[in-house]
UniProtKB/Swiss-Prot annotation:
Protein name, entry field: Trigger factor
GO terms for cellular component: cytoplasm
UniProt gene name: tig
Function: Involved in protein export. Acts as a chaperone by maintaining the newly synthesized protein in an open conformation. Functions as a peptidyl-prolyl cis-trans isomerase.
Molecular function GO terms recorded: peptidyl-prolyl cis-trans isomerase activity; protein folding chaperone; ribosome binding
UniProt xrefs under Pfam families: FKBP_C, Trigger_C, Trigger_N
Acidic residues bias (residue ranges): 448-482
The family this protein is said to belong to: Belongs to the FKBP-type PPIase family. Tig subfamily.
UniProt organism field: Mycobacterium sp. (strain JLS)
């Protein structure tokens, strides 16, 4: 087999392939053997019919079409392997010569990774915000912890923000009841904004037993996007009483003996979260600088495929109704033209980023180890609430392991870039990036940073949930409503 590569553009090539007929003869032999097992000819046992009779029965051209159809994908792969091209996406194949006894000739046009001239990574200078912790931020953490140990007490006054109320809801659209919007005894934290728009404003000022109507746009269900008249009735009002922030509370809520020790711990907790946020800013700034300094030719078909995927996902939930989609965008203060423009911009940036990261990974000779993949798998399994082995099976079934591998490699690459750059905060202080990205730009610290962020997020969620559970059943229901 002979193959040549013709460069059509920086991101697209045409591969010309010639396959001698003699190389296809084994394919014909296999095809006829399979056909002989399926076709019964008088006077011959199954699988024993002569090839000429089989050709006469099904036609030589039909057999040629079958053999060529089965042979082309493998020959294309062989041609790609023997060349230096790195395909992106599926090829467009055209068979230009197909005759029995003659060479098979076909072309394959495909998008490829372009050649990219990379900037001097050692000259990269990254500047990010310094870590600053305010008393208000620590107080917010303390308030959250106090709420965890708070109690709900009934009050005889109008509802206000922060109260927990039990409410009945009903709604009508065009004068007709909406059954799915009717509920009784629903617990809700006033001011949380967790239910429907306008509800909190309607509840504030209502006393037990009072009702109020308000107009809102339904966000889900059969009447999603339609204006509805909602009636809310307050059944009960409770306020959360918080424990005093003193030494006794510190001993109750933590392993510390004094409130000052507890505040120091909360300060460190805030600092830990901000360190992770700073690391994310470093990563994002590094990528931003690289994109600004590097020209990356974009393969249009790959960009368009990403655009098509985004559009499909956006309107799939609307049964691909373009009119409803346009109405939804209008309600958000946007338009289809703005959506399309933003989608293209984001798609181009995403493709450019992937191509740039892959080129950098090649230049830096980034290797993905088994430990890197295992760390990512464990991290993802925590995020999805699955066992690592279960998630691995899902990724294998959906052929998503290559995508995970590529993502891990890109993470290792940006870590290596950051490690080699000069990183300072806006006050001019050097930032030790090894804490986040490892001494050699590895993924271990990156994964640990992500773990810290997840742990802090989980702790916040647990705090809210435990607060509701410890305080009152109604608060539990309010959490569910959120």
């Amino acid at each position: 087999m002979k193959s040549t590569v013709e460069k059509l553009s920086p991101t697209r090539v045409r591969i010309n392939v010639e396959v001698p007929f003699t190389e296809l003869e084994p394919d014909f032999d296999r095809a006829f053997k399979e056909l002989a097992k399926q076709v019964r000819l008088p006077g011959f046992r199954p699988g024993k019919a002569p090839r000429k009779l089989l050709e006469a029965r099904v036609g030589r051209e039909a057999m040629l079409d079958q053999v060529v159809g089965e042979a082309v994908p493998g020959r294309y792969t062989e041609a790609v392997t023997s060349s230096d091209v790195q395909p992106l996406g599926q090829p467009e194949i055209e068979i230009t010569k197909k005759e029995y006894g003659e060479d098979l000739v076909f072309t394959a046009e495909v998008d490829v990774r372009p050649e990219i001239t990379l900037p001097d990574l050692s000259a990269l200078e990254i500047t990010v915000d310094p870590i600053e912790i305010t008393d208000e931020e620590v107080d917010t953490e303390l308030q959250s912890l106090r709420a965890r140990f708070g109690t709900l007490t009934g009050v005889d006054r109008p509802a206000k923000d922060g109260d927990f109320v039990s409410i009945d809801l009903s709604a009508t659209v065009d004068g007709k009841d909406v059954p799915e919007a009717t509920t009784e005894g629903l617990s809700h934290e006033v001011g949380s904004g967790q239910l429907i728009e306008g509800l909190d404003d309607a509840i504030v000022g209502l006393s037990e037993g009072e009702s109020k109507e308000f107009t809102t746009t339904l966000a889900a269900g059969e009447h999603a996007g339609k204006e509805a008249v909602v009636t809310v009735t307050v059944k009960s009002i409770k306020e959360r009483e918080l424990p005093e922030p003193d030494d006794e509370f510190a001993q109750l809520a933590s392993e510390f003996d004094t409130i000052d020790e507890l505040k120091e711990s909360l300060t460190e907790q805030v600092r830990r979260v901000k360190r992770v946020q700073q690391a994310e800013q470093i990563r994002d700034k590094a990528l931003e600088l690289l994109l600004e300094q590097t020209e990356v030719p974009l393969p249009e078909k790959i960009v368009q495929a990403q655009i098509d995927d985004t559009v499909h996902n956006a309107i799939h939930g609307l049964d691909h109704d373009e009119d409803r989609f346009a109405e939804q965008l209008a309600e958000q203060g946007s338009s289809r033209e703005e959506f399309d423009a933003n989608t293209r911009t984001e798609a181009e940036k995403a493709v450019k980023t992937q191509l740039l990261m892959d080129a950098l990974a090649d230049q830096l000779e980034v290797q993905v180890g088994q430990g890197d993949l295992t760390e990512r798998l464990v991290l993802m399994s925590r995020q999805y609430g699955l066992e690592p082995q279960q998630l691995l099976q899902i990724l294998q079934q959906n052929n998503q392991l290559p995508a995970m591998f590529a993502d891990v490699r890109r993470g290792l690459t940006i870590a290596a870039v950051v490690h080699g750059a000069t990183v300072k905060d806006t006050d001019g202080n050097d930032i030790d990036t090894t804490e986040f990205f490892g001494p050699s730009g590895g993924a271990q610290a990156e994964a640990e940073g992500a773990d810290e962020a997840d742990a802090d997020s989980d702790a916040d969620s647990d705090t809210e949930a435990d607060s509701d559970a410890d305080s009152d059943t109604e608060a539990d229901e309010a959490d569910e409503a959120k």
